[in-house]
């Protein structure tokens, strides 16, 4: 399911994630722990939800984005016709650093929240088979 929680307070986010977890009790919740994600990870843990924190660094981001690209190339990922997700995927870009590593991000002034959410979902799901996101 694709559920954006833009400008949503932590308690509401925890409540909505708890409701999703009750519908899908075998799911794995993965949340970025960086900056603003730290308090939500803590709130999810305090609520007793099974959350795995993910620390986003250039290297960890490169790993999950490379995996996402491969999943799309193989046809293992199917996404809803969500204009925000599709727009973010189309705008997302990679730049080669002087070190040779890739740095991935949204262009200046844009967001990559749904791209990162999809990449995180795929990174934990890929060993279990295809990923299908549905609009509900």
Q: Model-predicted segments: where are they?
A:
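RNase H-like, metal-dependent nuclease domains and their acidic two-metal-ion catalytic environment used
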Residues: 1-55, 62, 66, 76-136
């Amino acid at each position: 399911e694709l559920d954006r929680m833009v400008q949503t307070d932590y308690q509401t986010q925890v409540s909505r994630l708890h409701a999703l977890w009750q519908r899908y009790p075998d799911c794995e919740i993965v949340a970025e722990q960086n900056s603003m994600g730290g308090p939500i990870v803590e709130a999810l843990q305090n609520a007793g939800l099974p959350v795995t924190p993910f620390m986003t660094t250039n290297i960890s981001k490169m790993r999950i984005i490379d995996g996402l690209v491969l999943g799309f190339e193989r046809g293992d990922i199917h996404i809803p016709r969500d204009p925000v997700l599709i727009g973010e995927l189309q705008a997302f870009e990679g730049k080669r650093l002087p070190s040779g590593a890739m740095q991935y991000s949204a262009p200046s002034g844009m967001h990559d929240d749904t791209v990162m959410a999809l990449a995180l979902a795929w990174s934990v799901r890929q060993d279990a088979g295809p990923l299908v996101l549905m609009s509900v």
